[in-house]
Amino acid sequence: MMDAGRADQAARARALNVWRRMGYRIAPGDSFSYILHLRPAEWPIMAAHTALGTLLAVGLSPGAIAETAGDALLGIALWVLCLNGGTLALNSAYDRDAGDIGYLEAPPPPPRHLAAFALTLMAVGQVGALLLPPLFALDYAACFVLSVLYSVPPLRLKAVAGADWLINMWGFGTLTPLAGWALTGRPLEPWALLVMFAFCPLFAALYPLTQLYQYEEDRCRGDRTLALVLGMRRSLLAALLATLAAFALFFLAAAVGAAGWRWPLLALPLAAWLAVLVPWLRNHETMQPAQHQRGMYAALRAWAVTDLAVLAVFAL
């Protein structure tokens, strides 16, 4: 039988809004919970960051985009839905969070077979990746392994401060746009490598920000997340320093590549990041979890501005 806390969690998840109520009415049994734990709210963010790599490779010319559209659309779907969605669902299966989590407000209790579902979905994506350029398939396989190491006991590197940070900064920050570039089959250029490396410290900045609003819940569960080990102030300082390192690499890439007069556009996302991080650092001691959560989403908007600026500088 379902205990009272789990029953309350399930009721809130099902009644949160009209879309939830409609989904649970249409989908049989608990099957809509499987979809929710793929966290569709993150799909546009992941798709955009993967597509960034593709557009950096081919440019913004409609003709060049059309040449690689077939492989790009299939590869992005596999990366976003199978790999990233499966990773997040696998994470949910072992975290068993009761409160809000990244990209999923009022999560339903993890269904019984969520872990098996997630692993199967990621494996299906790996088979599909073999139909695409070899570098993409290799990139997918590397992230598949990292996802399992990150989420699944006994290793569960998510709960090991520092290891969780490294996996995410490389997996989302660098390997995701690399996957998009790999879908085109084009050789990597030096400036492109610098851009992809720049996204590594930029995600290093974002990652602890995603943990601050779950600070107390992670502490109660016994996880040693990066934010818990560093503390809030040092987490925010680390985010600020990592952001500055990322933009130093972006500016270096602009100097190496053919950015021309467009390189000053990189100052816009830098200003957006500083507008999020500096007030957060100044006010963190008095902020509530909901305010930390809003800060995380503000940082995600700064990330989106960064992607757009990078495209404007390097792909036009």
Give short role names for the model-derived ranges:
Residues I35-L36, E105-P187, W191:
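Intramembrane alpha-helical segments
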Residues L88-D97, I101, L146-A161, Y207, ...:
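C-terminal ends of transmembrane helices
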Residues A47-G53, W165-W181, A227-S235, Q293-V310:
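Small-residue-rich segments of transmembrane alpha-helices in multi-pass membrane proteins
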Residues A47-L90, A137-V148, L188-L209:
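Membrane-embedded alpha-helical segments that form the functional core of polytopic membrane enzymes
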Residues R20, P28, F32, A129, ...:
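Extended hydrophobic alpha-helices typical of membrane-associated regions
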